[in-house]
Each structure stands twice: as structure tokens, then as C-alpha cells.
Swiss-Prot record:
GO cellular component: chloroplast thylakoid membrane; photosystem II
InterPro entries: PS_antenna-like (IPR000932), PS_II_antenna-like_sf (IPR036001), PSII_PsbC (IPR005869), PSII_PsbC_sf (IPR044900)
Species classification: Eukaryota, Viridiplantae, Streptophyta, Embryophyta, Tracheophyta
Main location: plastid
Originating gene: psbC
UniProt-annotated binding residues for [CaMn4O5] cluster: E355
Lineage top rank: taxon: Eukaryota
GO MF assignments: chlorophyll binding; electron transporter, transferring electrons within the cyclic electron transport pathway of photosynthesis activity; metal ion binding
Purpose of the protein: One of the components of the core complex of photosystem II (PSII). It binds chlorophyll and helps catalyze the primary light-induced photochemical processes of PSII. PSII is a light-driven water:plastoquinone oxidoreductase, using light energy to abstract electrons from H(2)O, generating O(2) and a proton gradient subsequently used for ATP formation.
Localisation per UniProt entry: Plastid, Chloroplast thylakoid membrane
Membrane topology, as annotated: Multi-pass membrane protein
Protein name in the entry: Photosystem II CP43 reaction center protein
Amino acid sequence: METLFNGTLALTGRDQETTGFAWWAGNARLINLSGKLLGAHVAHAGLIVFWAGAMNLFEVAHFVPEKPMYEQGLILLPHLATLGWGVGPGGEVIDTFPYFVSGVLHLISSAVLGFGGIYHALLGPETLEESFPFFGYVWKDRNKMTTILGIHLILLGIGAFLLVFKASYFGGIYDTWAPGGGDVRKITNLTLSPSIIFGYLLKSPFGGEGWIVSVDDLEDIIGGHVWLGSICILGGIWHILTKPFAWARRALVWSGEAYLSYSLAALSVFGFIACCFVWFNNTAYPSEFYGPTGPEASQAQAFTFLVRDQRLGANVGSAQGPTGLGKYLMRSPTGEVIFGGETMRFWDLRAPWLEPLRGPNGLDLSRLKKDIQPWQERRSAEYMTHAPLGSLNSVGGVATEINAVNYVSPRSWLATSHFVLGFFLFVGHLWHAGRARAAAAGFEKGIDRDFEPVLSMTPLN
């Protein structure tokens, strides 16, 4: 038996001679060492969860309840607030203790994962096939691979149902559309109609359609999670019980690198969808926590100046702008009354502070004259001055504006980071898919190891 002290552990499976991969090729050294690969993955999970817990506590320590979350550069607390923890009417934070608990739970979990990762990387068996056949595998074993796929799908389905249970039974989640400016509520009347749920998938991705990103009520979102959770769990059971069909055995490449490329492609798609969701959707990502969307900030500016000039005596229904179109109000291509000026391009925006002022034909002139509430004015003025502008290097504001306030919206951060991550994951997919296909066809070249520069360098040790 191999132990820490009998010397064999030192290098096998870790150096270029025994694996064909140098240290910097990462987990490629562990392709055939299922026990060590398990250690690498568990340790990686520990690092992820440690970051989540530490960053969570960092945000709690720096949090100022009097300022909106999006003014404080927070990226984790908005997610917890969206799940209904610690917030009350209007998205006001009334209790930060749940956030503290979340951070501590993640830190404790990361310690457990870290221990498990180090154990399996250093002490545990190099391969699992002999001692723990249930957890062992061979990459070419198609039946085992689809069983593992099935287990993963079931875990994803359980994750979807956790959100359903939180929203429906355990305290509810934050609904930005609740009357009077948002509140936490239980989602009980779920949308389970397949025509509505799958109708989102059939929508055009453009304009007022917006594909699944256009979802704007929580009943649809939570009902969608019921459908997704059910499909994932049933699909998982199916993949555990069945073997791949002949067409799948022929069509797919069955190697570790191929599975890596499939996973990277899936994560890339998730990243691009998340980018669009966080940028455009103010229901799943409430503006109270993440700041307004771009269209929302633009429409808020038009609304704010309509309110101001109407108080100063302007007739907002008939005033002409410099182009001859309406200065404050105009008509959309389909005839609705919309805000005039540059914000006309964002006429499809729907936001909780604006919808009460719409009638059957768009913005209702009589409501704009008589029904505007103070909370709508306050909120739009706040959103107008917090547009999601800014760049990845945290320089906020319009690029051409010399007096811009250095503010970067969490929406900018989350959307750009997920776009960039989605892009790099896609490049990784192409790279590994190409290598996997070449290996399967038997013509991979790789780098000529005989003339690699590193071979002529002095060893580091």
C-alpha cells in the first residue's frame, strides 16, 4: 500500500516522465488517476466556496444600510437580497444577520471541501476503480459516463427545486413588481402551463420579444424552475438507467478531453445567457439591488425631466423637440405613446416605477398629469443618476464626460464578466474539441517535445 512515507508518492502521476504532461498542464497529468483528479476537483470546489464565504463577509463588513447596494460595489449581497433574505418593502435592508450567516456557512463548508481535496490529492488512493468501483470510471466506458451525466442532471434539478421551495414555502423571494415599489412575498400561483413556459423559448431574441430574457413576473420564473427541475431529474434518471444508443456512440467522441470540451461549450452558453439576463432583466435581477438597466436609466431620465418641466408649466403632450418629434412624448412604430427624445429607442422598457402610468395605448397623458407618485419621482431620479455605464477597469461614467462620477454598476460588472468568461470558455471549447477530435482520428501532432525550449533550460530545483 502506498503511504506518505514510502517514497512512491513523491513523483508518480505528477511529473513529465510518468504522465507525458509537464506540471503546467494541470489536470492533464491526472487523466488516468481518478483518485487524484477527485482531489483536484474537490480542492477547486473548496477554493470557490472559500471565495464566496470570504467575499460575502467582506461585503457585510463594508455594507452601509443607508446607501443602495448598487452604490457600494456589491456583487454577492444583491443575490442574497433577491432571494428575500434581510430585506423589506422597497428593497430596504432591515437585517444583515442572514448575510453574515451565509458567509460563515460558506467558510465552514470550504474548510470541509479543502480537507477533502487535500486528502484525496495527497493521501487517498491514486485510482478509485479497485477500492471504490462505484466512484471509479474509465473515460471510454460509455455506460458509466452517461450514468455520471445522469447524477449531475439530478443534482442540477434538485438545485432548481431549492429555489422553488424558497420562493413558495420558506419565506418567499423579493418581487420588484409588488405594489408600492417592491416587497418580499411567497410565490404561490406558479405558472405551469407548458405553452407559456416553452413559449418563451420560441420567442424572437430581438426587440420587444427578448426570448427567455423577457420574463417579467416571478410566477413564470418559479414555474419555469419547476419545469426545468423536473426535466433535469427525469433526464438524469433516464441517463442512469439507459445505455447510449448506437447513433450517439457513433456521433460523439468518448474521451476525457471530449467531455471537457462539451462542458466548456455548455458553460459558455450559460455565460452568454447570464450576460443578457443581468443586463436587460429587472425582474430576476431587481434594480433596487443591482441598479437600473441601461434602458431603465435612460427612460428614467426622460421621466424625471418630464416631471420637472410639467411642474414649470410645459404642456408635455404637445411640446415639440428640436427634430419636430414630440419633446417629451411621441408614438412608437406600433402606435403606443412613448417617451420622446433619445430614449425613444428604449421604448420597450418595462419597469415597476413606470407601468402604473401606462394605459391601453402606452403612456396615459391624464395619468402623467395627475397620478405621478412621489416614490416614482424619487426612484427615477435615483436611477437616472446611476446608469450602468463603466468599464472593466472600474472607471465609471460616460467616456466623454469630464465630470463623471466614478460609479460602476454591479450590472456592468456581472454582464461584462459573464460575457468575457463565456467567450473564453467558448475558445476553450474549440481548443479541446479540436484536440479531442484529432486524437480520436489518430492524427494529433502536438508540440515537438524533442526541441521544446524548456528542455534546454536549467531545472528549477
